[in-house]
Structures are given as structure tokens and as C-alpha cells.
């Protein structure tokens, strides 16, 4: 074992992985039921009380916000500043004697400012009788905030339209009608020009009559008038009903406004296109995808005295296969393994550094350099460690680099002799390692937003995929040339985010079967926090975003495993290998167009549970990551170490269904 410095264990750990006191003390604070206006500030004051309402000593009370961009909180002073309206959570943590932590979440409401105006828009300017009118409503507040989830009071100037209790507006008779929306005393109106429905009949066709669950049908509908002339701008809508072949199941699927349909469950489906009261239907069959294969555990490399973090498998300069794995919340140890025989994973060397957590490990493409991250260093310098792994049986530390990385490094990536290292969960720095003994910082990337945060960065083809929690994924040119960026001048050129704000990792891939370019965005959610000694509850899923049009990314599909949350993953050859924390390692078919809920569609090929009775936390699966390497699926498990598994060969497809 190599040791870079003596280890002094501190009770330092990131908030998302804290261990909390289980006694009956509680935090009482003046931010209970706090209500603020936008731009208003308030200073929190909190004490800790026991069951008898006596104040209990608290060495330090710290605060943080679940949404720092909208509600900024000074961790030390407790000053809270409201930047955006809505409901938010402020977490108060009392650090007690012996390092015990007591926590309480407080809800803070930030009022919306006065309404400035209401905007009403037509989604489609062609309005026919006997049709619902597609409208969008926005409330625009002072200070520029926009909201579209309020209940308006809608009225009409005449009886040419009807308005139901859910504010759906239907065209009844041809002519002009004025629709008025009112909210908080502010009104806005729009004139609706309604025409008599000219559609006589609709011709509905599809690219296939039968396909598997998960395969996408394309329906095309053409509207004609009484003279058999095409009505090109007819507002055609699509819908479906279905009946499962399995009487104990319920048919389900998804249909888009452009006529694409996917069935989740095998059954018979009726697809309908309509313009007002004129419709056409077509019956299709959806059969089982039938892609299950045996997925077997091959070998394990047990770590039973501490938690395991990330890992990386690589080919050494000697042509043999090796792996490196980090450890979490322990003593800063990194392990090296010989995995040439996947059924016999052999621990061959280790390095111990001044850290509690070595969260991430990466190896250069030539198999010569390993970079590991540090968090919880006793001297608070943290940073990265650069290691010579030309002989994995006898690895040697080359250098450490801490400049601008003292707040802790959670993830790293090596690309073309540059290390991209996260700094304190806020930004990443680019460090040149042409001379690994003398690493040099040459660039950095940050969003430049209040409360900016980042969890991961992944690089392919000169593009860095920066995973920024609430701000989603940023595509950053670090040498690709698409935005004239470079390692010393990273330039963001595309972005996508989603409502949960839990975006933790990104994996880009181009579909081999369709040519479409996707980024797969993963959540990381622990609804009840982390239990370092027992079973955990995890949540979240993978979001599939079609980035073929960089200016208009579209979220098209998800992989969500009921009851288990996502973590790290790998894609190769239209197959996904994903560690679903408590749900184990899952293998998922990504062939063809992707649309809807991939799990419901039966796209899962197989899975293993990675827990072990000899683990640090016995019989408790907590799969951390997966990597396909030379035909085997390697993985790490937070509780048990590393392992390998293998899929049986693909069986010939005997189904007759196909999408033409």
C-alpha cells in the first residue's frame, strides 16, 4: 500500500450523504412557516431543544437551500434572500458534540409579485366547428416571472364557443367570438375566427399493422373535402384505445401529435384521427418484444470493510486487463485489480491518500495515468492525485494538484492529456498533464449563475457534457470546434433542463439503428437521505433527450424502474447498462426509435442484484456504476465492492413483426 500522507479522520462529508443523530432533540427556528417577497431578505435564528423544551448545546448551526438559484442562503450567517417566487426548502443542521448532526427541513414561501399582464396564444390558427380550441395562457408578473399553472376566469362574448369547468374551449358555430381571460384583476382577450368544418373524410395509413412493444408506428392522416381535394392545414388530432391480450393487464401506450404511436403492452389498439366530428380509425396489433436473456454474475471483488465508490476498467500497457476502484466515507484508499479473468478479480495493489472519500477514478486512454479525486482531506486541500499505473501491480503516486480544488473534487474526467476536475460542486477546472509531475491549470467552466452547481462532466469528441443539477446538461466545446472552444476556452453551445432539478450525470450516444443523437440524463434522488449502515430508498430515472437538433432538444423517452433510483450508466451498441442503486445492474434494449416508457415496453433484457452476504453492508444491493468491457459488464456496488457479469448470446428473433 502506498500512502501519500498520514490520515486524520474528520467528520466531513457532503450534505447528500450525511449521517444524522437519532435522539429526540429537535431544531426550533424563526423560519418556521416563513413567507417572503421577491428580493426580500431574512436572517434565520435557530436553537436545539430536548423533549422537556430545554435548550441543548449546538456547536454550530448551518443552513443550506435546496434551490440556491431561487432562494439563496448564507450557510454560516443564515441570511436568506428570495430571488424567485414559489415554495422552497431551507435545511438547518445542528452539529452537536462528537460530530453528531441534527437536521430539520423548513418550508419557505416566496410570494409572486403583482400581475403585469396575461398572454393568450393560439397553438393552431385554423379553427373549425365541433373542435376544441388549442390555447395557451401565461401570467406575466412584475419582475418578469411567468406562470402557466393558474386557473383563469374565462368568458365569451357570445355563444359561438362553450367553456367547461376545466376551461376547455370548444367551437360550436362558425363566426367570430372574443374570449377573455381574467386573473387577479388583470384581463386579456383574443378574437377567435371559427370556420365551418370543411372536412368530409380522413384517410389514415400507417407504416405497419403489427410490431413489438416499444417499436414506434408512424401514422399519417390526410383530410379531404367534399370534392376530394386535400385540406392541407386541417388540424388533425390523434388518439387511441386498446385492449391487452393478457386479460389481467391493461393496455397502455403513447401517441404524439405528429401521429407516432408506441404500445407498452401487447394487445390490440385502435388508432383514431379526427377533425372535429369527422374521424377515421385503424386497428393494429402490438406483440411482446421478447428480448429477455440470462444475465449471470461471473466474478466478484469484495471490499467488506468500507464503502466502494466509482471504478474504471482498462487495458494495461502489458495487454492485460485491470480495474481501479475508489472508496467512500472511509480512509482515502484506492484499490487496483487484475480483471484479466473476469471470474477471478484479484486485488493487486492500493494507494491511500489524505481523504475520507475517493469518489471518482479515471485512467488515461493509453493505460499509463490514473487520476483520483479527493474529498474530506484533513488539511482541507483536497484536489486530485495523479498516479503512474504502467505497472498496476506496483502503482506509484506522481503528483498531487490542489490549486482551486480545495473545496473537494467529486468527479474527474481525462481527455487528451487534460483532467477536467470538479471544484466544490460549483465549476470544473481544466488541468494539463502533458507533464504529470507538473500539472498546470489552463481553463475552467462555470455557469456564472447564482447558486450554480455541478455534479459530473463527461467528454466525447471534444464536447464536455456538464451535468448541472437544476440547470440540466450543458454541451461545452472543449476542442470539437463546433463553437470554437478549446480546453483553455470552454464554450457552451447547447442546454437542456427539466423540472425535478435532480440532473446528476450525462451519457451521449448516437443510435446505431436510427442515426439520432441522444443525451441520456440521469437523476440522483435519496428521498429519506442516506443510511450508511442499512438499506436505502432511492428514486429518479433516466431521461432520453433527442439532441439531433442542437437548438431544439426534445425529451422523448424515459427508463424508470419502479421503486429504485438511477445512478451511473454506460451505452454501447444500442444497449444500456445502468446501475439502478437498490435495483441492481440492468441491461436495456435501445434499438429503434425511442419514445415513452422503456421499462413498461419490455425493453429490459436482464438484470442482476449486486449485493452480497459478505459485504460491508450485507445483503443490501446498492449498484453504483456499470461499464461494458470486452464483452463483460463490470460494476461497482457501494456496499460490496466490484464485480463482473455477462449476457448470454442473442437468440434468433422468431417474431414476424417489423416496422417498415
Predicted regions and their residues:
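Conserved short hydrophobic patches within well-ordered secondary structure
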Residues: 4-6, 80, 169, 311, ...
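Selective for proline/serine-rich intrinsically disordered segments
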Residues: 4, 83, 111-112, 132, ...
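Bacterial Sec-dependent N-terminal signal peptides
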Residues: 1-24
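Residue-level detector of intrinsically disordered/flexible regions characterized by low predicted structural confidence
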Residues: 4-7, 119, 308, 538
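Feature marking well-ordered beta-strand scaffolds used for ligand recognition
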Residues: 205-207, 264-660
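Extracytoplasmic soluble-region selector
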Residues: 22-291
